[in-house]
A protein has these predicted regions:
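Extended catalytic cores of very large enzyme megasubunits
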Residues: 1-109
Length: 109
């Protein structure tokens, strides 16, 4: 099984369930109904899309997320892709805020 390289450099085993959950959340956020088998098919397409990006059994989490965006959009789920992109942007903002707070706290200490 592949290893996913997280943003902090740590590695975890690839969990397709996490990809599936993220896609379901994007569908729910966009208010679009979905079928379980469609979600499973999208997950399979995502794995096929990022397969060429795997190097030495490892792939960066951002590469997987890019593949999710691409597959959702190419599958005609543009609104779902937008929801997914917005979720990623919001998570990035939160990470940046946390990093800034930690940096500030270290400065003060």
């Amino acid at each position: 099984m592949y290893q996913v390289v997280k943003r902090d450099g740590t590695e975890v085993s690839l969990d397709l369930g996490k990809i599936k959950t993220a896609i379901i959340k994007a569908f729910e956020a966009s208010g679009i109904a979905y079928e379980e088998n469609v979600i499973d098919f999208i997950v399979l397409k995502v794995t096929a899309d990022y397969a060429s990006k795997v190097k030495d059994g490892k792939i960066a989490v951002e590469e997987i997320q890019d593949s999710v965006e691409k597959v959702l959009s190419e599958s005609g789920y543009h609104d779902v892709a937008k929801s997914y992109i917005l979720y990623r942007k919001n998570r990035e903002k939160l990470r940046n805020i946390k990093s800034t707070i930690i940096d500030y706290k270290e400065l003060v200490d």
